[in-house]
Swiss-Prot record:
Required for the expression of anaerobic nitric oxide (NO) reductase, acts as a transcriptional activator for at least the norVW operon. Activation also requires sigma-54. The keyword ATP-binding applies. Pfam families: GAF, Sigma54_activat. This is Anaerobic nitric oxide reductase transcription regulator NorR. Pathway: Nitrogen metabolism; nitric oxide reduction. ATP binds at residues 215-222, 278-287. InterPro entries: AAA+_ATPase, GAF, GAF-like_dom_sf, Homeodomain-like_sf, NorR, P-loop_NTPase, Sigma_54_int, Sigma_54_int_dom_ATP-bd_1. PROSITE patterns: SIGMA54_INTERACT_1, SIGMA54_INTERACT_2, SIGMA54_INTERACT_3, SIGMA54_INTERACT_4. Residues 187-416 form the Sigma-54 factor interaction domain.
Length: 506
């Protein structure tokens, strides 16, 4: 056997050294890559007929954002169906899911691959994949040795999943409650900002509190609402969605509370509103700041007393609904301006959440790009869609004013452009395929930084100086607001508010 007792003991010890599951997983695959002298290793979690990367070593960073469906990846399907070690020869007809995703080897095909399915009892919970550019790399290791590695990895993953399930079910000591754990909701990201958001979602999901979700347009507030609902005791009941900004004033009340036959012209039958549809479930009110003051008052009554009245009906109906609301506005400012009721604001914001803009999420941009690349690959029937190193740098240097939604559209557009200029079913996205509307701003000359403005009064001079300071900080930090705030030694939220007041942003 090529594995000594010391090597196996070392792997087991590494699994105990990490502070958290993610650290342990990373130590595991890094150690395996070193022991097996292979080019890449990955630990994948199995869920809903797809493999979700948990930790990687030797692979492009965007792999962590990809979701590998069994239907789209025959090698992974073979691993999922097998109950034992799977070896793919160098001349295998099945494409490797990591072709083009090993840094420095983007144009080469992976030659050797070993897949180790991971089980908890009889249930498939994940897989280990090992890849090498040398065809004979894994021949010196027997199946028995690889099974031992798989057993160690399966034990670590099984324990992590069990703890995650217990935490999401509030069944750890000192808590109670039984309901489904949070499932995959495509909330992709490992940045500190997203890690904190996920923790806050787990905290509030198991309660029955109303939640106000804030954040810029395109940040993914609806995904946050879905994650909260899926992690709650109401998950077995419906999550009903309503975009308040798309509601004409004439039908808004009927959409929310329903109507009876004959209540108004065109009301030819009784109709349930969104609150009735969401009874015993969750109602997600997107763009809550767009509701009129009159409707805000009626919404407040529902939150206070739990009853509604259909339009044209004198009777009240009891409903049990949890309300999640989202807005891209600063509702505190809306309250001060008299456009939003203070009492409703306080009812909704029992547990406020803020979804960070993409420009403050660092390398999450690359993970999300990988996710969208995989989506495009499946949708267009391509064998692979990968990002070149220049494309990754280009995406990281862009400010993403449209956030995740803009990134999604940019990836889809780039794939179409790249496909049109390259024959075959393989697409490599280069920087020139991204026609981004806002280029990285060059740094201004140093001597202009403290140039004094010429204005009539102190207030105007101060505001002009503040504008110039903010513009220069943004230019020097690639239009990254968080980095600019740090450079100016101020809070990023305060910087956004000041920039808005000075007319530097909408």
């Amino acid at each position: 056997m090529s594995f000594s007792v010391e090597v196996l003991a070392g792997i087991a010890i590494e699994l105990q050294r990490g502070i958290g599951h993610q650290d342990r997983f990373q130590r595991l695959i890094t150690t395996l890559r070193q022991v097996l002298a292979c080019d890449a290793s990955a630990l994948l979690r199995y869920e809903s007929r797809q493999f979700i990367p948990l930790a990687i070593d030797g692979l492009a960073q965007d792999v962590l954002g990809r979701r590998f469906t069994l239907e789209g990846h025959p090698r992974l399907e073979a691993i999922a169906r097998a109950g034992d070690v799977v070896r793919f020869p160098a001349d295998s007809d099945l494409p490797d899911p990591y072709d083009g995703l090993i840094p420095g080897q983007e144009s080469l095909k992976v030659h050797a691959c070993v897949g180790l399915p991971l089980f908890a009892g009889q249930n498939l919970i994940g897989a280990l994949t090992l890849d090498a550019m040398t065809p004979e790399q894994f021949e010196v290791f027997s199946d028995e040795e690889l099974r031992l590695v798989a057993a160690l990895a399966a034990g670590a993953l099984s324990n992590a999943l069990l703890i995650e399930q217990l935490e999401s079910q509030n069944m750890l000591p000192g808590s109670s409650g039984v309901f489904e754990p949070i499932k995959e909701t495509h909330m992709i990201g490992l940045s500190p900002a997203m890690t904190q958001l996920k923790k806050e979602i787990e905290i509030v999901a198991g309660s029955d509190l109303n939640v106000l979700i804030g954040g810029e347009t395109g940040t993914g507030k609806e995904l946050v609402a879905k994650a909260i609902h899926q992690g709650s005791p109401r998950a077995v009941n419906p999550l009903v969605y309503l975009n308040c900004a798309a509601l004409p004033e004439s039908v808004a009340e009927s959409e929310l509370f329903g109507h009876v036959k004959g209540a108004f012209t065109g009301a030819i039958s009784n109709r349930s509103g969104k609150f009735e549809m969401a009874d015993n479930g969750t109602l997600f009110l997107d763009e809550i700041g767009e509701l009129s003051l009159a409707l805000q008052a009626k919404l407040l009554r529902v939150l206070q007393y739990g009853d509604i009245q259909r339009v044209g009906d004198d009777r009240s109906l009891r409903v049990d609904v949890r309300v999640l609301a989202a807005t891209n506005r600063d509702l505190r400012e809306e309250v001060l301006a008299g456009r939003f009721r203070a009492d409703l604001f306080h009812r909704l914001s029992v547990f406020p959440l803020f979804v960070p803009p993409l420009r403050e999420r660092g390398d999450d941009v690359v993970l999300l790009a990988g996710y969208f690349c995989e989506q495009c690959r499946l949708r267009l029937g391509l064998s692979r869609v990968v990002l070149s190193p220049d494309a990754r740098r280009h995406l990281l240097n862009y400010g993403w004013p449209g956030n995740v939604r803009e990134l999604e559209h940019a990836i889809h557009r780039a794939v179409v452009l790249a496909r049109a200029t390259r024959a075959g079913d393989e697409v490599i996205l280069e920087a020139q395929h991204f026609a981004l509307s806002e280029d990285v701003l060059p740094a201004p000359p140093a001597e202009s930084f403290l140039a004094l403005p010429t204005c009539r009064n102190l207030r105007e001079s101060t505001e002009n100086f503040q504008r110039e300071m903010i513009r220069q900080a943004l230019a020097q930090n690639n239009h990254n607001w968080a980095a600019s705030a740090r450079a100016l030694e101020t809070d990023v939220a305060n910087l956004h508010r000041l920039a808005k007041r000075l007319g530097l942003k909408d």
